[in-house]
Amino acid sequence: MDLDEAFLYVGEFGWCQKRLTGFLTLLQIYVACQSMLIVLVGAVPEYLIDNEDISTSKEDYIKHLHDANNFTSIVSEWHLIKHEAYKVNLASSLFFAGLLIGNVFFGPLSDKLGRRPVYLSGLFFDIIFGYFTALAPSYEVFAVSRFFVGVMNGGMALVSFVLTQEYVGKSYWALTGSLTNLIFAVGIAFYALLGFYIRNWRTLAFVANSPGIFFLLLSFVLPESPRWLYSRGYTAEAEAVLESMAAGNGVERPVVRLKSCPGTTANSAHSVFDLVKYGVLRWRTILLMYIWYVCSLVYYGLTLNAGELKGNLYLNVALYGLVEVPAFPLCLYFIEKSWSGRRRATAGFLVFAGFACIFTIFVPETNGDFINPTVLALFGKLSVSAAFNVVYIYTSELYPTVVRNAGLGVCAMACRFGGILSPFIPAMKSFNPSMPFVAFGISGISAGILSLLLPETRNKPIAETIEDLQSPAYQLLSRGNEVLAST
């Protein structure tokens, strides 16, 4: 039997896979806490300088500085105000730079060495550098530790997402992918709750990092991805993992015998360069990189342009996470419909997000009706969140197993560039107040239209090797499944 037939025999989403994927999706709470750490740890307290006619030296500012807040942050401890205020944003930028590097290197590394060892190593060092963050004796140590947390967190989270997908049958990839992103949004709200009760920034960083130990210890029982084992020629090992899953799913005396996987062996060399070497992957990668870049640009740009919410800091952080929750049931509904699928859902959500940005230009700020700029901006954020969710799932299905993590890593790298660029788009307001929303709108609409050039993957077999994508038999089977699904 081939791998997809084996999953049907074993159970595509049995009790064993539910435990494995449930554990890895809960890991996203830890990932979210690390990703959002700077929001509360770097919060700027209200402060008063009792003598504004002092020199610009830091020592003089400290003597005349007073604050009346009931929380601490790196700003209050290291007095990152006035000419040193930029250091908070610098630490945040270093974290995102680390994410970019982690996405680039961890993807190909896990395609070569295996998902499990790369994931475990990344999580271990993520925890180590997380404690360096909490115990940092100076801003410089804090900033460097945030960079390395970004490297490990971004790479580890990427590999754990792929593991979550590859533990289950292909028909459940949409569900597990959506759950991963849903729990991340819930994790943001959980971090806000921690911050509400823990007002000391060092204690907060320590507590937010500590669940990683729990996840690391339990992660040692995770098996290697059977899809990766099969794609690399470790057929016997893949059979053993599948038989273990079958036993966990209640199959009595399971016996799995896989066909040898054509086109690859344990010594096959696959790298990120395969994404440009083969034409079928080259154009997919170019289109996907642009789509990921736009998703990130519009998502973070809308967050900045919607304006800062007034009121309780911790409630605001929670709302920024929970506003994404409705995107996930919408995503699950549309991507499984024959008239929508992955491709049209991606296009639709991106186009809706783009038009929401453009329509914001024509609605007066003083409009008291239901349709106002804030509502349109939030609708745009909801739409682009749904697009982000679909794109994660869609990208996993477009790449064969042997280069799946490499493909996801390159796309995630493009995504980080969008996130880095998005804070600079609001500066375009100095030329025209409408220009940022025009830029976001055009980007969203163009990415939505270009996504229609990608092939649909709904109800199509997963390619294990690059040769699978190029074989006439695979293409014929894909068309046959598409016809059957539409009848």
UniProtKB/Swiss-Prot annotation:
The record, for InterPro entries, names:
MFS_dom, MFS_sugar_transport-like, MFS_trans_sf
* TM stretches of this protein: 23-43, 90-110, 117-137, 141-161, 178-198, 203-223, 286-306, 315-335, 345-365, 374-394, 408-428, 435-455
> Is Transmembrane among this UniProt entry's keywords?
yes
Q: Where do the record's glycosylation annotations fall on this chain?
A: N70
The UniProt entry's GO CC annotations, sorted and at most eight, read:
membrane
SUPFAM superfamilies membership: MFS general substrate transporter
Any idea which UniProt keywords this protein has? Glycoprotein, Ion transport, Membrane, Transmembrane, Transmembrane helix, Transport
**Which family does the UniProt entry place this protein in?**
Belongs to the major facilitator (TC 2.A.1) superfamily. Organic cation transporter (TC 2.A.1.19) family.
Function text: Probably transports organic cations.
Per its UniProt record, what PANTHER family does this chain match? SOLUTE CARRIER FAMILY 22 MEMBER (PTHR24064)
Instruction: Report the protein name in the record.
Output: Solute carrier family 22 member 15-like
Q: Which organism is it from?
A: Xenopus laevis
Taxonomy of the source species? Eukaryota, Metazoa, Chordata, Craniata, Vertebrata
Gene from which the chain derives: slc22a15b
